[in-house]
């Protein structure tokens, strides 16, 4: 009988470490809701002790996600576990994930400890986590380079202490699939109480083997796979969840396991993660790349037309990619837009219908026809604009030519005040940015600029993603319009609002800290 493989998503924890700019709470929540809709069993959404912002993100997601188990990471440190539990206590169901290094190299050079001390610490911290929840995951960091006898000792002790999931990470992407399968098999042979816990794997792609290692581990008996959407993560990335999920589905004949994933949500979730994280998906990426279902060879095209199974082992529809996308026009009503969003699987609570419809009408007047990808882009940007705004683009004008110095005039609403400035620049976009810097005095430094077409032809929307440096921190901004300069201006305004919000959060945290300090003095 087919057994279920638990899908553990770490896009918002391990995956976020690869980003050039931290995600806002709203952005993290949007991804979390998409993962919930896709049906992930467990989502690891942060490392609460690392910063007040991470604590807030975990708490916000824990409060709103109902159908997936929410997990937070904690080192084998008392404070880490206590803070993780505090951030998660509002969740319907939660897990604490604690870890410690087990390889000889890590124990000697990083921890400056011994294996016996590591085991003692693991036992104590697993028991501490069990005081807060019956669902505790324990990870043996760098398990791939840990001798099997040592690993078995740690695993047995952690299970005896109360760990319900034991995670075996290939932390540096070092092992070969046959080696990794051997580690899992070896644990089943050597650990007498292993039947009391789920064996999980967490692989990295340094040698391009993350998915292969995870599947080999599943074949050897692992029943939880950890990874990130699109394989994002530090260095070469994490195991690509969409690849593992579809491999399990397509090769069920060999693996004899299944997942609880809603496969129809894979493509949409992948695209959302790509957009929000500002990490384009390579065209040749398995499952979700733009070329994954494209056939250019004449022989292949002929074969597919005769029978798709000649050259396709799965269909675009199986991951929710509908090749025929219906369009709406400026004569379409609000109900029609909502109906189309419903058909695409979006709940009204996930976007602002009034804002979406206003933006839809403006775009429809320009383009004539609005397609599914247009609606999704407008809804995505609308989500950004639901966050409090201090800066708002009121007006801009640019003048440039092949022999002229680019000049821009910009008017920004800054809170209750409206300010205007003009500036020259190295092209129209730079001129707009120079004018904005004069208005705000933020003097942000542009680190990355990318432009992506959303749609086809001359009326395609241009999405500009930028990363800017301000006071040692990096901030991400997104802008969307049919005009590239306008998209660029909106992206910079989005950055400014993110900077402003970060400053407001810092002020609020300082205010609360001062309030708590005053209360202590009163007592």
UniProtKB/Swiss-Prot annotation:
Which residues participate in Mn(2+) binding? 14, 202, 204, 238
Return the similarity comment. Answer: Belongs to the alpha-IPM synthase/homocitrate synthase family. LeuA type 1 subfamily.
Regulatory domain as annotated region, ranges: 392-523
Q: Which PANTHER family match?
A: 2-ISOPROPYLMALATE SYNTHASE 1, CHLOROPLASTIC-RELATED, HOMOCITRATE SYNTHASE-RELATED
Q: Which residues form the Pyruvate carboxyltransferase domain?
A: 5-267
Reactions accelerated catalytically? 3-methyl-2-oxobutanoate + acetyl-CoA + H2O = (2S)-2-isopropylmalate + CoA + H(+)
Q: What class of enzyme is it?
A: transferase
Pfam families in the cross-refs: HCS_D2 (PF22617), HMGL-like (PF00682), LeuA_dimer (PF08502)
Output the CDD domains linked to this UniProt entry: DRE_TIM_IPMS
Entry-linked SUPFAM superfamilies: 2-isopropylmalate synthase LeuA, allosteric (dimerisation) domain, Aldolase
Q: In which pathway does it act?
A: Amino-acid biosynthesis; L-leucine biosynthesis; L-leucine from 3-methyl-2-oxobutanoate: step 1/4
Quaternary state and partners of this protein?
A: Homodimer.
Q: Which GO terms describe its cellular component?
A: cytosol
Keyword Ligase: yes or no?
no
Q: Where in the cell is it found?
A: Cytoplasm
The alphabetized list of GO BP terms reads: L-leucine biosynthetic process
Sorted alphabetically, which keywords does the UniProt record give? Amino-acid biosynthesis, Branched-chain amino acid biosynthesis, Cytoplasm, Leucine biosynthesis, Manganese, Metal-binding, Transferase
Cross-referenced InterPro entries = 2-IPM_HCS-like, 2-isopropylmalate_synth_dimer, AIPM/Hcit_synth_CS, Aldolase_TIM, LeuA/HCS_post-cat, LeuA_allosteric_dom_sf, LeuA_bact_synth, PYR_CT
**Keyword Cytoplasm included in the entry's annotation:** yes
Protein name, as recorded: 2-isopropylmalate synthase
Which function does this protein serve? Catalyzes the condensation of the acetyl group of acetyl-CoA with 3-methyl-2-oxobutanoate (2-ketoisovalerate) to form 3-carboxy-3-hydroxy-4-methylpentanoate (2-isopropylmalate).
Q: Which cofactor does it need?
A: Mn(2+)
**EC number from the UniProt entry:** 2.3.3.13
Q: What is the lineage of its organism?
A: Bacteria, Pseudomonadati, Pseudomonadota, Gammaproteobacteria, Enterobacterales
Q: Name one GO molecular function term.
A: acetyl-CoA C-acetyltransferase activity
């Amino acid at each position: 009988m087919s057994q279920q493989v638990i899908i553990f998503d770490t896009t918002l924890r391990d995956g976020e470490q690869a980003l050039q700019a931290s995600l806002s709470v709203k952005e993290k929540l949007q991804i979390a809701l998409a993962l919930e809709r896709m049906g992930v069993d467990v989502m690891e959404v942060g490392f609460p002790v690392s910063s007040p912002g991470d604590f807030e993100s975990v708490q916000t997601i824990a409060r709103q996600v109902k159908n997936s188990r929410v997990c937070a990471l904690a080192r084998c440190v008392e404070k880490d576990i206590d803070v993780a539990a505090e951030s998660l206590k509002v969740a319907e169901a939660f897990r604490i994930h604690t870890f410690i290094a087990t390889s000889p190299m890590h124990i000697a050079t990083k921890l400056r400890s011994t294996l016996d001390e590591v085991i003692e610490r693991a036992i104590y911290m697993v028991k501490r986590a069990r005081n807060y929840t019956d669902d505790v995951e324990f990870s043996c960091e760098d398990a791939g380079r840990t001798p099997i006898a040592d690993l078995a000792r740690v695993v047995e002790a952690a299970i005896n202490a109360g760990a319900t999931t034991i995670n075996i990470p290939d932390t540096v992407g070092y092992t070969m699939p046959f080696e990794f399968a051997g580690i899992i098999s070896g644990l089943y042979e050597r650990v007498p109480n292993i039947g009391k816990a789920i064996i999980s794997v967490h692989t990295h792609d340094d040698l391009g083997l993350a998915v292969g290692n995870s599947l080999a581990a599943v074949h050897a008996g692992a029943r939880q796979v950890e990874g990130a959407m699109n394989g994002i993560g530090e260095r070469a990335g994490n195991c690509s969840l969409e690849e593992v999920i579809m491999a399990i589905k397509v090769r069920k004949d060999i693996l004899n396991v299944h997942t609880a994933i809603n496969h129809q949500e894979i493509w949409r979730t992948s695209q959302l993660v790509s957009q929000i994280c500002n990490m384009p998906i390579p065209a040749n990426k398995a499952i979700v790349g733009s070329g994954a279902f494209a056939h250019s060879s004449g022989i292949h095209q002929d074969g597919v037309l005769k029978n798709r199974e000649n050259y396709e082992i799965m269909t675009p529809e199986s991951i929710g990619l509908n090749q025929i996308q219906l369009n709406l026009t400026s004569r379409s009503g609000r109900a029609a837009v909502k109906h189309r969003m419903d058909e695409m699987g979006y709940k009204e609570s996930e976007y602002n219908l009034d804002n979406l419809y206003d933006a839809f009408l403006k775009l429809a007047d320009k383009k004539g026809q609005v397609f599914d990808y247009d609606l999704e882009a407008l809804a995505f940007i609308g989500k950004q604009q639901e966050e409090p705004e201090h800066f708002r683009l009121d007006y801009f004008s640019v003048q440039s030519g092949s022999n002229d110095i680019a000049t821009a005039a910009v008017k920004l609403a800054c809170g209750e005040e409206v300010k205007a400035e003009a500036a020259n620049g190295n092209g129209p976009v730079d001129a707009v940015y120079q004018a904005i810097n004069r208005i705000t005095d933020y003097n942000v430094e542009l680190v990355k600029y990318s432009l992506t077409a959303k749609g086809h032809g001359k009326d395609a929307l241009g999405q500009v993603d930028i990363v800017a440096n301000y006071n040692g921190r990096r901030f991400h901004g997104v802008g969307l319009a049919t005009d590239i300069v306008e998209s660029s201006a909106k992206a910079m305004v989005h950055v400014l609002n993110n900077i402003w919000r970060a400053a407001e959060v810092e002020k609020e945290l300082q205010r609360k800290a001062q309030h708590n300090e005053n209360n202590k003095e009163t007592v």
